[in-house]
Amino acid sequence: MKERQQKRKGFTLVEVLVVVVILGLLAALVVPRVVGRREDAKRTAAAVQIREIEQALEMYRLDSSLYPSTAQGLEALVTKPSIPPEPRKYREGGYLRKLPADPWGSPFVYRRPGDHGEYDLFSLGADGEEGGDGPGKDITNWE
């Protein structure tokens, strides 16, 4: 009788190590780019939200001939302000259904009068603090 040699099926240790090294290199190249894109997407989303709030502020101004004061804040776009200066006309249902938070979960900052225009509207960015550079830079309505 002939003895048959059984061939083992599987990968050698060297083959497995080569695959692990290749996957590690790919992860080192891809992960930083993906993480950076997420922050870019959040910054873009904040800029879009600022534009939407600006549109609501313009509708408010068209109805009442003025922008909400800093004391009234952006809440004046959701509910009619009860502190002066009260708007002469106020749209039923407000100008926004609710105030959005920025992509990092913080409220937008609104100041009237603004340092850069009739009002300043901005997100504090990823760091949650005014000013900053890079990913922590504020997203504003004037830049």
Provide a role label for each language-model segment.
Residues 1-11:
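N-terminal leader/signal peptides at the extreme start of proteins
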Residues 3, 40-44, 51, 55-58, ...:
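Short, surface-exposed interaction loops/tails
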Residues 11, 29, 72:
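Short beta-to-alpha loop/turn elements within the nucleotide-binding domains of ABC transporters
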Residues 17-33:
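Alpha-helical hydrophobic helix detector
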Residues 57-98:
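Short, glycine/small-hydrophobic-rich surface segments
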